[in-house]
Design a protein with these regions (language model features):
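Hydrophobic lipid-interacting interfaces of membrane-associated proteins
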Residues: 1-10, 15-48, 53-109, 116-124, ...
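Extended, charged low-complexity segments
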Residues: 125-129
Length: 169
């Protein structure tokens, strides 16, 4: 495979079989989560906000605090046309699309604001003020509660759900 850091936008074009990667030690997640599986990366970008291309993880599993969850496939495709960015995520557990002008780094705050509006007793408002974000999104879930539980034990009831909307902050 290829990992090229010689240009302003690094290029990643490789396939890997990861036996164990700790996302916390790689500075990809705050908590201690191990992942293993097969990965196929074909993208450019120096950070998550300028990621363009595709990343696929399959035959994988996550381990957090002794809890083990397997997943067969997760595919992320990111494209851009002018200022309009589109990200499509497909898996056995859910499908999601987000399209418009947005910063991936700001999405947690945006969705925290959105969820706080409808679930104020479960989700606190974000600490930081939102930047200008204009996008639409759709999410269709199948059996996702076990995965959500890994990241937020207070949220549940999202199996077999559909959520769509738009944000203009």
């Amino acid at each position: 495979g290829l990992v090229d850091f010689s240009k302003a936008e690094p290029r990643f074009d490789f396939t890997a079989n990861i036996e164990k990667a700790n996302l916390q030690r790689l500075n990809l997640y705050k908590e201690n989560i191990d992942i293993n599986g097969q990965m196929d990366f074909r993208f450019t970008g120096s950070d998550i906000d300028n990621f363009l291309g595709s990343a696929r993880i399959h035959h994988a599993s996550l381990l957090k605090n002794g809890k083990h969850i397997s997943f067969d496939s997760l595919s992320i495709v990111s494209t851009r046309e002018g200022n309009n960015k589109t990200i499509v995520i497909n898996s056995n557990e859910f499908d999601a699309t987000i399209e418009g002008e947005f910063s991936i780094n700001e999405l947690p705050n945006v969705f925290q604001t959105f969820l706080n509006r409808y679930y104020p007793s479960y989700v606190n408002p974000p600490v930081r003020q939102l930047k200008n974000e204009r996008f639409s999104f759709t999410v269709h879930t199948r059996k996702v509660d076990d995965y959500i539980d890994l990241f937020n034990k207070r949220l549940s009831g999202f199996n077999d759900a559909s959520v769509s909307g738009s944000i203009d902050s």
